Swiss-Prot record:
Lineage, top ranks: Bacteria, Thermotogati, Thermotogota, Thermotogae, Thermotogales
Disulfide bridge positions per record: none
Any GO MF annotation of the entry: zinc ion binding
GO cellular component: cytoplasm; small ribosomal subunit
Gene Ontology biological process terms in this record: translation
Name of the protein this chain belongs to: Small ribosomal subunit protein uS14
Species: Thermotoga petrophila (strain ATCC BAA-488 / DSM 13995 / JCM 10881 / RKU-1)
Amino acid sequence: MAKKAMIERWKKPKKYKVREYTRCHICGRPRAVYREFGLCRVCFRKLALEGKLPGVRKASW
């Protein structure tokens, strides 16, 4: 879980667009964020296994 101050700083508008970066919308994790869902890999897996992400299925081949 990201520190509260880091999340608040991330939410503020940036002076330059190039300084913006992705964070997970649930836990605030800055790494391994899937842009399409706005979630980190940990939260994505958790929600997908619970069936809360429509159209996402576990792969099997």
